[in-house]
Amino acid sequence: MPNITGGAGEILVVMDQFNWDNSAGEMLQDILKEELPGLPQSEPLFDVIQITAASFDSFYKFHRSIVMTSIDSNLEPRVRFRENIWAKPQIMVQLEAPSSSALHTLIRENEARIQSFLVQYDRDRLMATYLDSKDPAIQKELSAHHQVRLAIPRGYNLDFSKDEYSSVSIEA
């Protein structure tokens, strides 16, 4: 299976323009662009890219995080959380509904589940990346002096380490 494309914190939403510009799309945008708490400046949870189903081709199929909406009168409302459909490690939230109003209701009723799934999976992937690139020497030193286990990425320098405190920096 191919590797994912797209950056950390980036969500690809596949939704027709009419719904994107109306209540279902606005609600989905509110969920995905909610302000991150605790930062000194306003930052959204995710950077959101919206495309239509007609534009969703082999280039976009490998995106790391996809929210795909489908509206068809033959569909029952449902949310599916899927992994590794076209690439690895990929996630997808599928939202299916028989109408625009049913899609809006489906999004509203599953707001917390949708956001939690996307946030947790993105966080887990980011942590795995840092764990894969950690500097074991700095980790060992910090553990010995402070009884704490931190995954410090390679490229950082341990300026000094004492029993009371340590200093780690990176040259920009």
Give the role of each language-model region.
Residues 1-172:
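N-terminal targeting sequences that direct proteins away from the cytosol to non-cytosolic compartments
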